[in-house]
Amino acid sequence: MCSFCNQNKITGQIYQPTPLEVERILDKAASDLGERTKNAEIAFFGGSFTAIDRTYMLSLLDAAKKFRDKFCGIRISTRPDYIDKEILDILKSYGVTSIELGAQSMSDDVLLANDRGHSAESVFKSSQLIKSYGFSLGLQMMTGLYKSDIQKDLYTAETFVKINPDTVRIYPTVIMKDTKLAELYLNGEYTPYSLEKSVNLCSRLIELFEKNNIKIIRLGLHYSDSLVNNSYGDNYHPAFKELCENKLFYDKFIEKAKDFLDLNEIKTVVINSKSLSKFLGQKRSNVKKLNELGYDFSVCFDDTLQKYELYLK
């Protein structure tokens, strides 16, 4: 098992659903969502889908296939070393549309230290195979793993860009109890990134992926009582993505301000109207920090700007 993995406590789920339960869940979802199902996917997450018992996997796909025409697709998450042509032929025949790979890192030494059981090369090969079959490809990475560092995390993200997935998920490492990582932490052999360090890094990753038109569909773990009650450290934050977006806008402002000889020349910040809360920061934290530095400005909108774009005038 991976050094960091305790899926039951991460997801709060301690049982495997039966095919009948899957059908009931999907039937209720289709009823509740109505026309909105056309924008909703059926998703199998919380483990390595193609690594589970084959008969059980096929029974779940059978259940999902009955509802395939009511939803926009079927998405699964799995390991890069459990992808081959036979598996992809099966997934294609059942209407699966998106496959996400838990790559976690593209540094072999980090993968080895965390007992991942696969190499960076297997991520490359499985990604290419998935794309050749016409599936949407998603890649998942973890920052701050045991034996990783900022440069290795940036290398993973930059390598993802070369692979060119459709989507990415970024998960800052959270130390779950009853894992190898927890033992290393308690023995003083592993020090997790601080929340500030994680935010600084992941704000850079947002910009990198956005610049390369790769959609970030998750940044940080979903909140659950089980997650909070069964983890160590204080680097988890339920609004982690928002903190990263706030940091990204703050850094962009400071960088753009360097073009002005006098900070008093800056009268207006121009952003997309949908990005207002991201720019202002939680409890207007960005504005307060900038005011403390001597900046005094108003905000106006230009909705032709990209989500994370701004300029000063």
Regions found by a protein language model. Give the residues of each.
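Conserved non-cysteine loop/helix-boundary elements of the Radical SAM core domain that shape
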Residues: 10-24, 46-170, 177-197
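Auxiliary Fe-S-binding modules of radical SAM enzymes
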Residues: 188-313
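A generic secondary-structure signal
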Residues: 28-32, 63-67, 90, 129, ...
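Local cysteine-cluster metal-coordination motifs and their immediate loop/turn environment
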Residues: 1-9
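Short acidic/His/Gly/Ser-rich catalytic and metal-binding motifs that mark active-site loops
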Residues: 1-2, 176-183, 227-229
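Short helix-terminating capping/connector loops at secondary-structure junctions
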Residues: 34-39, 69-71, 261-265
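Short Fe-S-cluster ligation motifs
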Residues: 25-48
